[in-house]
A protein has these predicted regions:
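N-terminal secretory signal peptides that target proteins for export/translocation
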Residues: 1-4
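Core alpha-helical transmembrane segments of integral membrane proteins
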Residues: 218-328, 334-337, 344-347
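Short hydrophobic alpha-helical segments that form membrane-spanning helices or hydrophobic packing faces
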Residues: 43-49, 298-299, 368, 440-441
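Generic detector of multi-pass transmembrane helix bundles and their immediately adjacent loops
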Residues: 303-457
Length: 457
């Protein structure tokens, strides 16, 4: 099997992966939980918790691969024995050596870490540093200790039930189910005995308890349903699969048939990305460019957007051939590296929320990155042709120039909008701080490149 076919097949298997468990936990997926400053479905809470703990969206126990919902539900409802399951991620080899752990392993049990004296000392050191000055920079090992401590706290919160804040209480924070709660007792009984009727009865009791609270403290059922749909859809995974098919089709199938089919795959991927962004906007109530994950996905989207725009004008496959590798690489990175790129939807701090100028500034600047990413792709096509001794047509050079023009235009507008945002927020348009200075330097460098091409004629 070729690497490309293997990659596509793996993506399909990931998209349709069904967690193994005797009970149908679909009803639990849509139960609202308050965590991380917002209300979210249990499905999302479970996925984010397991990613935070293990760096993966699934856990293998006794040779059986378990999805996030069944894993987190088991930690919550049947916690006995989980302290001996390798669940806590430690990725830094030096830190593992420091703790005397097996450097070839990535996951460790709660018990072996909780009883590790060197880890305890490292956590006490970090705590003392933070108590003295919360802004003090930590070294690599101290940062790793802090991260491991956070993961241990996640585990403790799950097995104790403290993290499963399911009940609106009329206050800002929701509460976990009490040990004597009838819904919790039914859920636990049904889960332990694989009794679907008892488990569903527990869910019904829990929904009744949630519905009995004041409406203004409850989660919006429509938003919860939309987020469950989004979480199960994996739109950005499907987008990179379709972009990959588009790029391969354009590369190996010459002629009009290959061009039309490649166009169709790229357009389908683009549209499913649009669906993904619309869903994230509805869920979060803001523009989808507030962290590195969203920025990477947005740049991939913009790269295909500009490629389709130029293809509609020039009818040349070079734009899509240049855009698809960039988009595929970006989306695969976002899809497969959750520890590096956190896909969780977080609420914005008040100073950044509901700020029109900040939103337009960030969207415009990141779209300029997309145009430059397309220029990168087209530029590599030119380099490839030059290396193999193939003639580079003037039209191809012109395509590269056009993509750079779009990037420079958007970068200039975005830089100006950044000044407008600064003036709106802090009362000054330009202050020559490092970020502003380097934004101007980047713009001037690209302007020099564009004008230098004309001067060289």
């Amino acid at each position: 099997m070729t690497p490309i076919r293997h990659l596509v097949l793996s993506a399909f298997l990931l998209a349709f992966c069904v967690p193994a468990h005797a009970l149908d936990l679909t009803g639990l997926e849509a139960i609202p939980v308050q965590e991380g400053g917002r209300k979210k479905p249990f499905l999302v809470f479970a996925d984010e918790s397991l990613l935070s703990l293990t760096g993966k969206s699934a856990h293998t126990k006794d040779g059986i691969k378990l999805g996030p919902v069944v894993t987190v539900a088991s930690l919550w409802l049947t916690p006995v024995g989980w302290e001996d399951q390798p669940l806590v991620l430690i990725g830094n080899k030096k830190f593992k050596d420091h703790l005397g752990l097996d450097p070839s392993k990535k996951l460790f049990t709660y018990r072996e870490l909780a009883t590790n004296e060197k880890l305890r000392a490292a956590l006490q050191e970090v705590s003392a540093i933070r108590a003295k000055n919360p802004k003090t920079s930590l070294d690599t090992l101290q940062r790793e200790a802090s991260t491991v401590g956070m993961r241990l706290a996640v585990f403790e919160g799950l097995v104790s039930g403290r993290s499963d804040t399911l009940l609106p209480t009329g206050a800002a924070a929701w509460s976990p189910l009490g040990s004597g709660d009838s819904a919790l007792a039914k859920l636990r009984e049904g889960f332990m005995s694989d009794d679907q009727a008892t488990f569903d009865a527990g869910l019904a009791l829990l929904r009744g308890e949630q519905a009995g609270q004041e409406p203004r403290f409850q989660a919006d059922p429509g938003k919860i349903a939309i987020e469950v749909f989004y979480q199960n859809l994996h739109p950005f995974r499907w987008a990179w699969i379709l972009y990959l098919l588009a790029g391969v089709t354009l590369l190996v199938l010459p002629g009009r048939a290959g061009y039309v089919l490649g166009w169709a795959f790229a357009l389908a991927g683009f549209l499913i990305q649009v669906v993904g962004f619309v869903l994230r906007i509805v869920i979060s109530g803001r523009a989808p460019v507030t962290n590195m994950y969203e920025s990477v996905v947005w740049v991939a989207f913009g790269t295909i957007l500009f490629a389709l725009f130029f293809e509609a004008i020039y009818r040349s496959r070079y734009f899509l051939l240049g855009a698809t590798p960039v988009a595929v690489a970006s989306l695969i990175l976002a899809d497969t590296q959750p520890v590096i790129l956190d896909s969780a939807i977080h609420p914005l701090v008040p100073v950044l929320a509901d700020n029109f100028w900040l939103t337009t500034h960030v969207l415009t600047i990141t779209l300029s990155y997309a145009a430059f990413a397309l220029a990168l792709g087209v530029g590599h096509i030119i380099l490839g042709k030059t290396i193999i001794g193939s003639k580079v047509s003037p039209a191809l050079n012109n395509y590269l120039y056009r993509t750079l023009q779009i990037g420079v235009l958007l970068l200039a507008i975005g830089t100006i909008l950044g000044g407008v945002w600064a003036n709106y927020s802090w009362g000054r348009f330009w202050d020559w701080d490092p970020k502003e200075t380097w934004a101007l330097i980047a713009l001037l460098a690209y302007l020099f490149l564009l004008h230098g091409r004309v001067a060289g004629k």
